[in-house]
Amino acid sequence: MRFVDEAVITVEAGDGGNGVASFRREKFVPFGGPDGGDGGRGGSIYIQADDDTSTLVDYRYTRKFRAERGKNGAGANCTGRGGEDVVLKVPVGTTIVDTDSGDIIGDLVEDGQRVMVASGGEGGLGNTHFKSSTNRAPRKCTTGTKGEFREIRLELKVLADVGLLGMPNAGKSTFIRAVSAAKPKVADYPFTTMVPNLGVVDADRHRSFVMADIPGLIEGAAEGAGLGIRFLKHLARTRILLHIIDVQPIDGSDPAHNAKAIMNELAKFSPTLAKLPIVLVLNKLDQIAEESREEWCQHILDELQWTGPVFKTSGLLEEGTKEVVYYLMDQIEQQREREVEDPEYAAEVRAFREQLEAETREQTIAAKEAYRAMRKAQRLESMMDDDDDFDDDEDDGDVESIYVRD
């Protein structure tokens, strides 16, 4: 199934049914009085998180949703039936944004969590409500109110504890295959991974975390190179970034230069995202002779001036991967425990997350607009080039025809 992480839809709740003006008409009951019923309430529209849904692709093809109108009231004080509600299911991790105001309507992070995005109209009042001592036969009734109408944007960010970061073909997909049951496509060419992949990593019994593999970045991604920075937003909800470095790139490039390029692109996209804890993994050690591995790895670390945690692995042979898993599990558990025990730290984490969410959303929208502008400029340039092919100045091959009347 095609992975879609954004969609814009319109939702319109049902209008309320109309109240009616009716009078009781029964044999032997003169002056029965008003008995008009109220209109039913219009159906509302809800969006609900669902574990069985993994993409927003359905909302790319069906963009308009409307709930049922409430039924009109009837005589004998009968209230009209309410309109049926509409429930739209989306993946867990979906943020709902009002496109007009930019306000966040809801953030669905748990299975079954539900948010109302359009409220149904109220039913109108029947004439029973308007009787009084001075008006015993009111003919007044009211119509139902209009249902709420909205245009909303659905934004999906995968929920994971650890996010994989690195150049294309650095071995991220091979690594996640080695430590989890996830089976992303693996091949010997760049950009094998085209969409985010999630895997549950089991450290020990009852100890596990979720890891996300996103498509690789290249230098200039912030300007739209490669797959651009479209998928970087999926790292916004992770706790730790795992930077995978290919120690022996197939194109002969410098691993340290590649790592610096990734760090720069990350900082360009979101300075807040770049502040997340980063763990370095020097991968594909099997590509280097055993006697020169330590020296080469140390050279890379010296070039990067790296002082943080670092691991040396071979995802293909699954060497050193367990140590990475245990370290990540310990770090995640420590963060979780501290958030529970220290309210001040928990508040700081929430503020950091809110800032990160806002920053990544803003940068993603800006990047999309810049990409559209670039594509428009390219199309215009292409049209200009086509026009240049028709040069009217050169008339060497032109033939002038003169018609003479006999």
From Swiss-Prot:
SUPFAM superfamilies: Obg GTP-binding protein N-terminal domain, P-loop containing nucleoside triphosphate hydrolases. It comes from Acinetobacter baumannii (strain ATCC 17978 / DSM 105126 / CIP 53.77 / LMG 1025 / NCDC KC755 / 5377). Its main location: cytoplasm. Belongs to the TRAFAC class OBG-HflX-like GTPase superfamily. OBG GTPase family. GTP binds at residues 166-173, 191-195, 213-216, 283-286, 314-316. Its cofactor is Mg(2+). GO terms for biological process: ribosome biogenesis. Mg(2+) binds at residues 173, 193. The gene is obg. PANTHER family: DEVELOPMENTALLY REGULATED GTP-BINDING PROTEIN-RELATED, MITOCHONDRIAL RIBOSOME-ASSOCIATED GTPASE 2. Pfam families: GTP1_OBG (PF01018), MMR_HSR1 (PF01926). This is GTPase Obg. Keywords: Cytoplasm, GTP-binding, Hydrolase, Magnesium, Metal-binding, Nucleotide-binding. An essential GTPase which binds GTP, GDP and possibly (p)ppGpp with moderate affinity, with high nucleotide exchange rates and a fairly low GTP hydrolysis rate. Plays a role in control of the cell cycle, stress response, ribosome biogenesis and in those bacteria that undergo differentiation, in morphogenesis control. Residues 383-399 have a biased composition (Acidic residues). It is an enzyme of class 3 (hydrolase). It is found in: Cytoplasm. One of its GO terms (cellular component) is cytoplasm. Residues 120-143, 381-406 are annotated as: Disordered.
